[in-house]
Each structure stands twice: as structure tokens, then as C-alpha cells.
């Protein structure tokens, strides 16, 4: 879809090109401080993903605009990450819920900087460390299907699927062993906590919190820098980490959905 087409619907729309296709982003005028925003990724061949940050009182603003966008594009596959209250049925669509997530946000000035858990540890930039981070991800996440899946997940972040990789991204090494990593992406001016992980032997020692806080403070010196994060609703460890980082939880549960137009259902 052309930027001129979507900007007719979404004032001040921004566009970026990424590995999987163009990204379009807009905020609700006057509601910047609530991060009420919409992002769409055109993945090519009629495949789109939508990501809506909104609260119930903003749904009305986005309903008409999302409906207009979906009427303008030709799509064969549409996935959306939206607040649970978003009224797909009212717009003539069915939403099949695939997963539940929580969202968090805050400003850099709210994130405390803890002491490094071990003074002999060394932080290093993520630059050139994709394979090392993939190994860390595989070791840290028992649900990861395997090496290729870990490489793909890390590679997507490096190649900008979620936005440009930021300089605060890095990993930590202790006694010659890499024990954890944190990857941060630029999402149209906000810092997105794209991935944080530590190996089992380093868990519950404060490393994830330190890596995230250290990385965030390396990204920017602006105390009002926005930070965003999203996590699976069943991920208790990440939930506790968000609390430790002093980020605010978006009150509403988030749905990851597959969207189908009602008229196309048999």
C-alpha cells in the first residue's frame, strides 16, 4: 500500500522499510502520553500484521480508521495484536484468539539502574554476536524448538523486523562464559524490549534486570524516552522483570488474533 493512501486515513503517518516489508505507524492526536498508536507491517503477497496500542476509550478513534485501511488493501492473511476490547465483530470481522499477552510501558527516568550482580562480569555490544545470542536463547528457553528457530528469532531482530537494533543491545560474560543477553529495537522513536534472556545457571540473580536497565540507559540520555514491552501472559519471570524495571502495565489484556472477514466465512 502506498504511503499516500494510508496517510489519507492516518494523519502524520510514518513509514519505514524493514526485512519483511514496509511498516506504517501513527499515533492518536492528543493522546501521545498514553502511547495510543497503530502499526501495520506489509509483509508482501497480501500478508499483513497489525499492532494496536490503545485503551477502551480510544477504540472509537481507531475503529473507523482500521476499517478504512482494511477496505483499501487486498489481503489474504491478517494477524493483529490488539486490546481484548477491540470490537472486531462490530466491524464485520471475526477474531480467532491465538494467544494472550500483557503490555508494559514507561519512561527512562522511571527505570532504576541496579548494581551489576557480579563485579567481574563484562558487558559487550551485540554487534557481531548474533550466533552467541542465539545459543543463549536456546539455552535459556525450554520452549524454543531448536537451533534454527533460535537463529531465526535473533536474526529477525538484527535485521530490523521490529525496528533498528539499538546500541544498548548486548550480552554479559562471566568467567569466560556468556550468561545472558538483551536486545532492544527502535519502534518509531520508542525503545522496544525485543528480547531478554539468561541461561538457567544465571537466573534469579538479577542479571536480566541489570541487562535491561543497563541497555536502556545506554540507548538514550533523555529521561522522557518512551519504553515499551510485550510478553506472553504465562511468562511469570518476564512479568516480575517488568515490575522490577518499574514499568507500568497496560490495564487491558492483549489478544493476538487471526482476522477473517465475516462475509468470507462459509
Language model segments and positions:
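Flexible, substrate/cofactor-facing loop regions flanked by secondary structure
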Residues: 5-9, 115-191
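Conserved donor-binding loop and adjoining core beta-sheet/short helix segment
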Residues: 11-73, 174, 179-194, 199-200
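Short, high-confidence coil segments that cap the C-terminus of an alpha-helix
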Residues: 21, 75, 224-226
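A structural microfeature
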Residues: 36, 97-99, 179-180, 208, ...
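Acyl-donor-binding surface of acyltransferase catalytic domains
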Residues: 53-119, 253-259
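Conserved acetyl-CoA-binding loop-helix of GNAT-fold acetyltransferases
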Residues: 58-71, 198, 204-221, 239-244
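Conserved hydrophobic beta-strand within the GNAT/NAT acetyltransferase core sheet
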Residues: 78-80, 193, 227-231
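Conserved active-site tyrosine of GNAT-family acetyltransferases
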Residues: 88-93, 241-243, 247
Amino acid at each position: 500500500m502506498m504511503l499516500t493512501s494510508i496517510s489519507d486515513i492516518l494523519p502524520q503517518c510514518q513509514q519505514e522499510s524493514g526485512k519483511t516489508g514496509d511498516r506504517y505507524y501513527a499515533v492518536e492526536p492528543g493522546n501521545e502520553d498514553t502511547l495510543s498508536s497503530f502499526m501495520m507491517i506489509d509483509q508482501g503477497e497480501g500478508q499483513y500484521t497489525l499492532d494496536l496500542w490503545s485503551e477502551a476509550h480510544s477504540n472509537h478513534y481507531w475503529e473507523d480508521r482500521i476499517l478504512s485501511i482494511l477496505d483499501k488493501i487486498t489481503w489474504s492473511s491478517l494477524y493483529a495484536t490488539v486490546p481484548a476490547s477491540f470490537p472486531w465483530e462490530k466491524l464485520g470481522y471475526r477474531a480467532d484468539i491465538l494467544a494472550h499477552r500483557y503490555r508494559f510501558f514507561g519512561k527512562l527516568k522511571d527505570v532504576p539502574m541496579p548494581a551489576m550482580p557480579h563485579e567481574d562480569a563484562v558487558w559487550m555490544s551485540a554487534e557481531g554476536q548474533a550466533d552467541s545470542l542465539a545459543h543463549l536463547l536456546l539455552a535459556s528457553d525450554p520452549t524454543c524448538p531448536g537451533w534454527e528457530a533460535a537463529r531465526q528469532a535473533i536474526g529477525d531482530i538484527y535485521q530490523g523486523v521490529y525496528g533498528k537494533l539499538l546500541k544498548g543491545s548486548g550480552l554479559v560474560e562471566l568467567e569466560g562464559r556468556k550468561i545472558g543477553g538483551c536486545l532492544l529495537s527502535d519502534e518509531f522513536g520508542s525503545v522496544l524490549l525485543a528480547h531478554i534472556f539468561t541461561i538457567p545457571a544465571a537466573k534469579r540473580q538479577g542479571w536480566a534486570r541489570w541487562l535491561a536497565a543497563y541497555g536502556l540507559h545506554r540507548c538514550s540520555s533523555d529521561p522522557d524516552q518512551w519504553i515499551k514491552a510485550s510478553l506472553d501472559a504465562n511468562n511469570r519471570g518476564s512479568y516480575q522483570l517488568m515490575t522490577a524495571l518499574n514499568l507500568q502495565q497496560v490495564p487491558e489484556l492483549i489478544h493476538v488474533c487471526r482476522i477473517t472477514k465475516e462475509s468470507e466465512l462459509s
